UniProtKB/Swiss-Prot annotation:
This is Photosystem II D2 protein. HAMAP family: PSII_PsbD_D2. 2 of the reaction center chlorophylls (ChlD1 and ChlD2) are entirely coordinated by water. It comes from the Bacteria. GO terms for molecular function: chlorophyll binding; electron transporter, transferring electrons within the cyclic electron transport pathway of photosynthesis activity; iron ion binding; oxygen evolving activity. It catalyses: 2 a plastoquinone + 4 hnu + 2 H2O = 2 a plastoquinol + O2. Fe cation binds at H214, H268. It is a multi-pass membrane protein. InterPro entries: D1/D2 (IPR055266), Photo_II_D1/D2_sf (IPR036854), Photo_RC_L/M (IPR000484), Photo_RC_L/M_CS (IPR055265), PSII_PsbD/D2 (IPR005868). PSII is composed of 1 copy each of membrane proteins PsbA, PsbB, PsbC, PsbD, PsbE, PsbF, PsbH, PsbI, PsbJ, PsbK, PsbL, PsbM, PsbT, PsbX, PsbY, PsbZ, Psb30/Ycf12, peripheral proteins PsbO, CyanoQ (PsbQ), PsbU, PsbV and a large number of cofactors. It forms dimeric complexes. It is found in: Cellular thylakoid membrane. One of its GO terms (biological process) is photosynthetic electron transport in photosystem II.
């Protein structure tokens, strides 16, 4: 008699089969995150290309915004919906369009389509980094770093207009359209003087500076460990030894600044922390703008400038510029409101 010891083979369900197929080793990894990433990215990109090629913004912004109307790559856009539509999600099957594709495009339905699919596509890409990091056995800091751009996208394109009266006040998906949105933020919110904007600029420019310094320092301290024509050919991905000298780099920057990183782990964590924190802080600031929160208002300088024609600061001059932007931008940007400002209310600086 033969006795077999062990577990009886269990029946594999559809979930196990699907899990194996999704995680199969292939040129482009799919994974569970790909179920969200690939369709959403395809839809967002396809919607943007369709909108910038064929769809006008005449009915929502009174503008031409497509290649078909004569715009170029810098001036095309998928424009935000009309102000009158509020925060409607503008589904194709909704009451606004009622399955009429042409009407849906005219109302700005492609903007909400691109915005929502784009947001979920970015989230899918972050989940992809989590998933692959788990599969190969590394920590998920890449995904954590990518949360910065996601926070900026969600705060600017979704949270800000949700705090305003409609999707109309979100940026359009186009180069010139986003430039107009930046000017709008400055004129109506004095965004450049906002401390969260300052932290964002410090994070992004600081991250760029750290990246440049780090790359240059590594290139400066590469080991001359080969007779190849250049140092790049001497590198082997599987080599056991270091490819540059941390000790030499530390000595160099100690002489430059009197202080330097002596720990590679702290150094690279700092390079991660600076730009990601900057992105998150700017996102927090945008949410504040959505709620129309004010930042720095130096009222004493404004009062003195109003009373004394000879007193003016860069701050008061910028406030006047913001007033000018609001006065001249509102009639152009919100044609449907039919704003008319008499000449006497338009701002004039003390120097004019």
């Amino acid at each position: 008699m033969t006795i077999a010891v062990g577990r009886a083979p269990q029946e594999r369900g559809w979930f196990d089969v699907l899990d194996d197929w999704l995680k199969r080793d292939r040129f482009v990894f799919v994974g569970w995150s790909g179920i969200l990433l690939f369709p959403c990215a395809f839809m967002a990109l396809g919607g943007w290309l369709t909108g910038t090629t064929f769809v006008t913004s005449w009915y929502t912004h009174g503008l031409a915004s497509s290649y078909l109307e004569g715009c170029n790559f810098l001036t095309v856009a998928v424009s935000s919906p009309a102000d009158s539509l509020g925060h409607s999600l503008l589904f194709l099957w909704g009451p606004e369009a009622n399955w009429n594709f042409a009407r849906w495009c005219q109302l700005g339905g492609l903007w909400s389509f691109v915005a929502l699919h784009g947001a979920f596509g970015l989230i899918g890409f972050m989940l992809r980094q989590f998933e692959i990091a788990r599969l190969v056995g590394i920590r998920p800091y890449n995904a954590i770093a990518f949360s910065g751009p996601i926070a900026v996208f969600v705060s600017v394109f979704l949270m800000y207009p949700l705090g305003q009266s409609s999707w109309f006040f979100a940026p359009s998906f186009g180069v010139a359209g986003i430039f107009r949105f930046i000017l709008f933020l400055q004129g109506f919110h004095n965004w450049t003087l906002n401390p969260f904007h300052m932290m964002g600029v410090a994070g992004i420019l600081g991250g760029a500076l750290l990246c440049a310094i780090h790359g240059a320092t590594v290139e400066n301290t590469l080991f001359e460990d080969s007779d190849q024509a250049n140092t790049f050919r001497a590198f082997e991905p599987t080599q056991a030894e270091e490819t540059y000298s941390m000790v030499t780099a530390n000595r160099f920057w100690s002489q430059i600044f009197g202080i330097a990183f002596s720990n590679k782990r702290w150094l690279h964590f700092f390079m991660l922390f600076v730009p990601v924190t900057g992105l998150w802080m700017s996102s927090v600031g945008i949410v504040g703008l959505a709620l129309n929160l004010r930042a720095y208002d130096f009222v004493s300088q404004e009062i003195r400038a109003a009373e004394d024609p000879e007193f003016e600061t860069f701050y008061t001059k910028n406030i006047l510029l913001n007033e000018g932007m609001r006065a001249w931008m509102a009639p152009q940007d919100q044609i449907h409101e039919q704003f008319v400002f008499p000449e006497e209310v338009l701002p004039r600086g003390n120097a004019l």
